[in-house]
């Protein structure tokens, strides 16, 4: 009788180990077949050589957009409107929107432009705007008066 119980336990124990191993193998295979968590978004065709940075990258359902500047002449209102318009286009191309922005960082060439930038900025993100930091920064590319980057969800 003891031998039968021992054999039965050994059989059940072996079956449990085999099932656990199969479950791990299956979940590992599914993870390998799953879509990658990281996806790169570009505003143009893929460059022939690796660029210095990516315009946008999503990881899971989070989307990170690089800073957007204005390369044309104009005052802070023109530059802010342009940057926010480009951000809106990039968000929508990635399946997001201004209302889904969680975090925004604004870099101003001159903090004296804060009030004028805010006039254009306010209301662009819907009724519940994202968290934001605004900093003075020298050397913004292309002589832009503002650079804005965002983190959103898709």
Positions of PLM-derived features:
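Residue-level signal for inorganic ion chemistry
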Residues: 87
């Amino acid at each position: 009788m003891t031998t039968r119980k021992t054999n039965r336990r050994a059989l059940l124990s072996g079956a449990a180990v085999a099932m656990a191993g199969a479950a791990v193998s299956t979940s590992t295979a599914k993870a390998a077949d799953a879509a990658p968590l990281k996806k790169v978004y570009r505003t143009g065709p893929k460059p022939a050589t690796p660029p210095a940075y990516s315009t946008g990258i999503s990881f899971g359902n989070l989307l990170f957009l690089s800073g957007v500047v204005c390369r044309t002449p104009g005052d802070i209102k023109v530059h802010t409107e342009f940057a926010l318009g480009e951000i809106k286009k990039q968000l929508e191309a990635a399946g997001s929107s201004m209302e889904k922005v969680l975090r925004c960082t604004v870099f101003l060439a001159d903090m004296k432009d804060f009030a004028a930038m805010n006039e254009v900025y306010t209301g662009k993100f819907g009724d519940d705007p994202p968290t934001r930091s605004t900093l003075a920064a020298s050397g913004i590319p292309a002589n832009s008066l503002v650079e804005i980057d965002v983190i959103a969800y898709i």
